[in-house]
From Swiss-Prot:
Residues reported to bind GTP: 56-63, 103-107, 161-164
InterPro entries: P-loop_NTPase, Small_GTP-bd, Small_GTPase
Pfam short name (any one): Ras
GO BP term, pick one: intracellular protein transport
Post-translational changes noted in the entry: This sequence lacks the C-terminal cysteine motifs subject to isoprenylation in other Rab proteins.
Motif Effector region mapped to chain: 77-85
SUPFAM superfamilies given in the database record: P-loop containing nucleoside triphosphate hydrolases
Keyword terms of this UniProt record: GTP-binding, Nucleotide-binding
Gene: rab5B
GO terms for MF: GTP binding; GTPase activity
Gene3D superfamilies according to UniProt: P-loop containing nucleotide triphosphate hydrolases
Protein name (Swiss-Prot/TrEMBL): Putative ras-related protein Rab-5B
UniProt family annotation: Belongs to the small GTPase superfamily. Rab family.
Length: 214
């Protein structure tokens, strides 16, 4: 199934995010993992918990997307070192879902670490920048790695981020053709700046997860 929206708001200053905003993540330099201050008070309230991994080239907006989803914030971010870990609780179709989100680094030097993060993932969101064609071409490599190494039941979603920026280089029709080759992947164009389609993207992922694991 393909879900695309051609409207969105995004900006690209100071890494993947622009404008103001707070950064509440604390880094563990030894492990290369950033643990979000967002936490859950009572894990027993969740009916289902799932691991989700964010993949894609650096500066495509992975961290901005996760920050918008988890904290409803948008602002400048530093490049992720290794991976960042966040938790988001959602109620979808009257089911309490806990998403354990691994936001992976997009730099080439961290590429060898990536399989460690997406192994055991129930879902993956691969992000590209609609104004940079090369990030969509690289997305195909991420998808290929997932197909080889991840669970065959993995829920795959593609996110075309920064949709309001000028000079679009990746057309929706091109993405839809690629998705038709993949089969049942989810696709949304998103805006971390405005929040457009962020909740919709993850809600659809949760629905697929519920269907897969009910």
């Amino acid at each position: 199934m393909s879900n695309a929206n051609n409207n969105g708001q995004a900006t690209a200053k100071g890494g993947c995010c622009g404008g103001g905003g707070s950064q509440d993540n604390k880094a563990n330099q030894n492990s290369g993992i950033v643990v979000s201050n967002t936490s859950t008070d009572n894990r027993n309230k969740f009916d289902k918990g799932f691991k989700l991994v964010l993949l894609g080239e650096m500066n495509t907006g992975k961290t901005c997307i996760s920050s918008r989803l988890v904290r409803n914030e948008f602002g400048p971010t530093d490049s992720t070192i290794g991976a960042a870990f966040l938790v988001k609780s959602m109620v979808v179709d009257n089911i309490n879902i806990k998403l354990e989100i691994w936001d992976t680094a997009g730099q080439e030097r961290y590429r060898s670490l990536t399989p460690m993060y997406y192994r055991g993932a129930a879902a993956a969101v691969v992000v590209y920048d609609i104004t940079k064609k090369n990030t969509f071409e690289t997305l195909k490599r991420w998808v290929s790695e997932l197909q080889k190494h991840a669970s065959p039941n993995l829920i795959l979603a593609l996110a075309g981020n920064k949709v309001d920026l000028p000079n679009r280089e990746v057309q929706v029709d091109e993405v839809n053709r690629y998705i038709s080759e993949l089969g049942n992947a989810i696709f949304f164009e998103t805006s971390a700046a405005s929040g457009q389609n962020i909740n919709e993207l993850f809600t659809e992922i949760c629905r697929r997860l519920i269907e897969n694991y009910k």
